[in-house]
A protein has these predicted regions:
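Active-site beta-loop-alpha junctions enriched in small/polar residues
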Residues: 124-126, 149-151, 179-181, 205-207, ...
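Short glycine-enriched, charge-decorated loop/helix-capping segments at active-site entrances
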Residues: 161-163, 215-221, 280, 342-345
Length: 447
């Protein structure tokens, strides 16, 4: 076939073909976009958009925190006004001698200045807020700790400081507890509060998974040089005393004693010792004998923590350890009247619930979940008998809602009074909820 007889075919250039395909695809996509989405599809799309927006927000927040940096945190702390003592006072000299006899004497002088407290409310996340601290003082607590404060957030974010640090003139003596693993950041955070509390505490005792992830609490204990540097930075840079809360180290007690002595000589003025290791959490007997050995080795006040369930346990703990104070946590959450010597009872818990709500009305917690968490513990035995009221309490959104539930609990208890079990039934208490087999105290320790 000659060239003159070839069919008259015009080839489409590649670019033109691609453009044509793209136009076809775009037309199809436009048609798809124009088609109305089903209700379920719209919900899926909205959910995806919401999740994406949240991811972007968190990403922006992380970037902002990185940009602030440690130096900016220090600058913000030093520039803080509004009555906060953020400057380094003349006696807050990092180069001064922090250990030795002079420090030991100053630690005891501080202890006497705050009244030599024997009954201490522990720092508890979302639980030792102002309303509950005031309630504990009402029943006899002589020293209270704030909930744990995250040093990085506290140093950098004004909103976090406002929401989580709630001092009051009547709430003294008060210790503000911080967690963290950076000396400069811890100091920056603590300088925001030093004018509004009596001491600053370093959390070296939290055994929870979140502390492992955040590298703080009891997960710092194996890093002796680090924890000593944290205490030294605080003691050398603040105008108020520095305290610390630790757990026992695994193995020989000499390891714990050695660490305690190092913290004392780094500037720690009061040491709280919990009588279990990080791994044990609350699952075994508290070793009061080990706490006693730490107390005997130190030259500063020591507070014992762990194993207190009943009022009589406080006396036993102090006698067994020789410590200067007893710190209460879980038992006080269920029965803050323990500070005044009252045992847990169904009848008493109704009155305690009302007393807490009165305090919460005067000093509202930052969220209703905090308020409800307290009532679930205080009313644990009654709510275990009246399950429907648990759901009603869970739906409460404010003090008035919660008070209505307390009224309903009281009415239900009265109606069931004839069939009620003994008020002192240990198996029914919140304290015993996770202690397998109801482990009972033995010599030298307590559950």
């Amino acid at each position: 076939m000659s060239a003159s007889t070839l069919p008259d075919v015009v080839a489409t250039p590649p670019t033109a073909a691609a453009d044509a395909d793209a136009a076809t695809t775009a037309t199809a996509a436009s048609a798809a976009d124009a088609a109305p989405l089903s209700k379920s599809a719209r919900k899926r799309q909205q959910k995806l958009e919401t999740l994406e927006a949240r991811k972007e927000k968190k990403k922006a927040e992380r970037k902002k925190r990185r940009e602030l940096g440690k130096q900016k945190a220090l600058e913000e702390a030093e520039a803080e006004e509004e009555g906060e003592d953020t400057s380094s006072p003349p006696d807050a000299d990092p180069a001064r001698e922090l250990g030795g006899p002079a420090h030991h004497a100053a630690a005891w002088a501080f202890w006497r200045r705050i009244g030599q407290p024997r009954l201490v409310l522990a720092p508890m996340v979302n639980q030792s807020e102002l309303a509950f601290r005031m309630l504990a003082r009402q029943y006899g607590a002589e020293l209270c700790y704030t909930p744990m404060l995250h040093s990085t957030l506290f140093a950098q974010e004004e909103v976090y400081r406002r929401d989580n640090f709630d001092p009051h003139a009547a709430d003294r003596p008060l210790v503000a507890q911080f967690c963290g693993d950076d000396p400069a950041t811890l100091l920056a955070a603590a300088r925001h509060v030093q004018g509004r509390c009596d001491a600053v505490d370093l959390n070296l005792g939290c055994p929870q998974a979140i502390a492992r992830k955040g590298h703080y609490g009891a997960f710092l204990l194996p890093e002796r040089d680090l924890v000593v540097s944290l205490v030294r930075a605080l003691a050398g840079g603040l105008s108020v005393p520095v305290t610390a809360k630790i757990r026992l180290l695994p193995g020989d007690i000499d390891e714990t004693i050695s660490l305690a002595l190092a913290l004392q000589e780094a500037g720690c003025s009061v040491l709280t010792v919990h009588g279990r290791t990080r791994e044990q959490k609350c699952s075994c007997l508290c070793d009061w004998a080990a706490i006693a050995k730490v107390k005997a080795a130190l030259s500063i006040p020591v507070i014992a923590n762990g194993g207190v369930e009943h009022p009589a346990d406080i006396r036993r703990l102090l006698a067994a350890t020789g410590c200067d104070g007893a710190m209460l946590s879980e038992a006080a959450l269920e029965n803050p009247a323990i500070f005044g010597g009252a045992p847990v009872s169904r009848a008493g818990q109704i009155g305690i619930a009302r007393a807490y709500l009165a305090r919460a009305r005067d000093h509202p917690p930052r969220s209703s979940s905090i308020l409800k968490a307290h009532l679930f513990k205080v009313l644990f035995m009654a709510l275990d008998r009246h399950r429907a009221l648990r759901e009603r309490l869970g739906a409460a959104s404010d003090v008035d809602d919660a008070l209505a539930v307390v009224d309903a609990v009281e009415a239900a208890e009265r109606a069931a009074e004839a069939d009620a079990a003994d008020d002192d039934g240990i198996g029914l208490t919140w304290y015993r909820r996770h202690r397998a087999g109801g482990a009972q105290p033995s010599e030298g320790g307590a559950a």
